[in-house]
Amino acid sequence: VRPLFLLLMAIVLFAAGLLQAGEQDAIRTAGDVLLAVLPASAAGLTWYHHDFQGTLQFARAASLTLGVTFGLKYLVNEKRPDGGEHSFPSGHASLSFCAAEFMRKRYGGSVTIPAYAAAAFVGYSRVASKRHYTHDVLAGAALGIGSSYFFTRPWHGWCVQLDGGSRHGMLRLSRAW
């Protein structure tokens, strides 16, 4: 898992550098690259752990995410900020957050923060490049997180989760048997 953590951190730091440069095309391209990297990382983790059940869980979550996302795009047909069609919800955000939540819930640990940071950058890139409104990205993120949360079960190893629901926050350790 450590090589994946380092790869995700390198990509997030690269994306942060683009933010400082402020180049809209570079930010959009970095978001597109992360859109491919996040699901590939989620699938790669299942392969690394020889976790066939995890592969099925991620496939189900991603399928539901994409099906609902594209169904809503054609049902709502909201105009994009750049004048295009099918803005709501953001497919980039939905799939990115689906992958990030899958990695968090299935494996926890060191991949959680960089995966969510990368997914957040994907969402930011969609708004910065005028492809989506903020509410498109938030709806896509909620859809992706919800799908993965519903379909994913913690792996048989230890799972570390941060819970901000209480006033003080909580760190939860769990292990599936």
Segments (PLM) and residue ranges:
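Interfacial segments of alpha-helical transmembrane regions
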Residues: 45-64
